[in-house]
């Protein structure tokens, strides 16, 4: 089993080292568009990306000072990274291109703006949220009528916990260009503020605004399915995940969504099959963590423990393998904290969670993570402090409310804790399955 697990998990790192070496050694060469090792999306989508890349490369061979082509290549790398999940390679490739375009190399401020806009997207993707916000703010100062830069501001302000600012930025984005990108952000903000029905409505608009089969449309469709899943509507969630798999076969986020549906239904063998297919399509730490949860629920504690420990080892290896001169590094503090917590090592988890929280002290997700870690350490005073903060936006996420209820009950506020757990069950009757409560020694309501 360990050999099989490691084979799956090695996909987490196999695509993250090639470019990091070549880029640092040959900064003047154009990064390659790597050959995909598997089918990912429609052939015409791949063909468009390849053609755009080749045209830009040929243009730069004729005129190395054609700065527009560096913007084009950066856009290509960002798109390819999103589709393939090879974020380390393509984020650094894109940054290398954008470094060619700044106010010192061109008097064209529109190109500078485009460079800032793309750079902010890369920094967000690599979880460098503070830098992403500063970059997006510079971009907005150059062009206040571009919807994309306000999308970056929404994302960065959400991650930094500046939720009121994010709402203002989203309103501005919607006024400029109501489309899939703006509708999906409106949905996420409504979810943050506890408006689950409104979040579903906005995400439906996002799906309707997209072209079926394209990655961004299927991302929106699977996020809509997630909203249904998290509010207890398994049938609607499954229908959307399956629809996404028809429009975009083997789409990893639809596969992992089906794994969650089957897990909730306690069909653990089916869940395991979907989770493994998702990992083979695209390795994500969250996917492998779900795999471990499924093993745990199947009663195979040894496989669950083994898988969780492998996640830690591979995340650490990824950090160790990252060159010191990498143009942009992936901040994995949250991922490491979650991995250690899932592996039953809350003391180590706390160190990484504190690093994450120090960067964004008002972010509700960062507060939720550290609150749960403190609870696992039996530090109920600090757990309650951060439970208060994680509820600041009045979220109606069932798992979040249930965790808060457990914390408040343990801290001595039984009435408040019980009410929150009841509220969580009213939102999602399947919250026990979401949190694996059957196999964990946590408070439950029967």
For every predicted segment, state its role.
Residues 75, 79-82, 121, 155, ...:
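Residue-level recognition of tetratricopeptide repeat
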Residues 59, 100-101, 138-139, 172-173, ...:
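Canonical positions in the second alpha-helix
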Residues 64, 106, 110, 144, ...:
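Short coil turns that delineate tetratricopeptide repeat
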Residues 68, 75, 114, 148, ...:
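Start-of-helix register in tetratricopeptide repeats
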Residues 20-114, 134, 168, 419, ...:
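N-terminal leader/linker segments that initiate helical-solenoid repeat arrays
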Residues 72, 114, 118, 152, ...:
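Canonical tetratricopeptide repeat
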């Amino acid at each position: 089993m360990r050999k099989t697990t490691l084979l799956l998990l090695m996909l987490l790192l196999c695509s993250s080292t090639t470019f990091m070496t070549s880029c640092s050694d040959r900064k003047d060469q154009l990064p390659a568009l790597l050959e995909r090792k598997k089918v990912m999306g429609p052939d015409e989508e791949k063909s468009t990306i390849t053609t755009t890349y080749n045209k830009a490369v040929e243009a730069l061979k004729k005129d190395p000072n054609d700065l527009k082509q560096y913007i084009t290549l950066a856009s290509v790398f960002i798109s390819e990274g999103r589709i393939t999940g090879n974020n380390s390679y393509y984020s650094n490739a894109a940054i290398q291109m954008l470094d060619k375009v700044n106010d010192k190399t061109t008097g064209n401020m529109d190109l500078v703006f485009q460079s800032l806009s793309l750079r902010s997207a890369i920094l967000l993707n690599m979880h460098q949220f503070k830098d992403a916000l500063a970059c997006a703010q510079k971009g907005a100062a150059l062009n206040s009528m571009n919807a994309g830069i306000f999308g970056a501001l929404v994302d960065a302000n959400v991650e930094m916990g500046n939720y009121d600012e994010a709402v203002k930025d989203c309103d501005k984005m919607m006024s400029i260009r109501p489309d899939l990108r703006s509708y999906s952000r409106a949905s996420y903000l409504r979810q943050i503020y506890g408006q689950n029905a409104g979040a579903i409505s906005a995400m439906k608009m996002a799906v309707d605004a997209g072209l079926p089969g394209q990655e961004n449309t299927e991302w929106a469709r699977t996020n809509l399915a997630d909203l249904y899943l998290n509010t207890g509507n398994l049938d609607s969630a499954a229908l959307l995940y399956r629809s996404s798999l028809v429009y975009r076969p083997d789409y990893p986020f639809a596969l992992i969504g089906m794994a969650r549906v089957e897990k909730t239904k306690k069909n653990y063998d089916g869940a395991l099959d979907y989770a493994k297919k998702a990992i083979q399509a695209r390795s994500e730490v969250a996917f492998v963590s779900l795999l471990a949860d499924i093993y745990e629920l199947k009663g195979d504690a040894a496989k669950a423990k083994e898988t969780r420990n492998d996640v830690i080892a591979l995340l650490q290896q990824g950090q160790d393998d990252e060159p010191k001169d990498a143009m942009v590094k992936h901040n994995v503090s949250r991922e490491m904290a979650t991995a250690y917590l899932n592996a039953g090592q809350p003391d180590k988890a706390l160190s990484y969670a504190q690093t994450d929280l120090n960067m964004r002290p008002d972010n509700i997700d960062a507060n939720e993570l550290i609150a749960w870690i403190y609870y696992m350490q039996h530090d109920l005073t600090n757990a309650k402090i951060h439970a208060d903060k994680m509820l600041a936006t009045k979220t109606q996420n069932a798992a979040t409310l249930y965790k808060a209820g457990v914390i408040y009950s343990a801290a001595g506020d039984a009435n408040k804790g019980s009410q929150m757990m009841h509220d969580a069950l009213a939102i999602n009757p399947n919250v026990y399955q979401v949190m694996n409560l059957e196999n964990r020694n946590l408070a439950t309501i029967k």
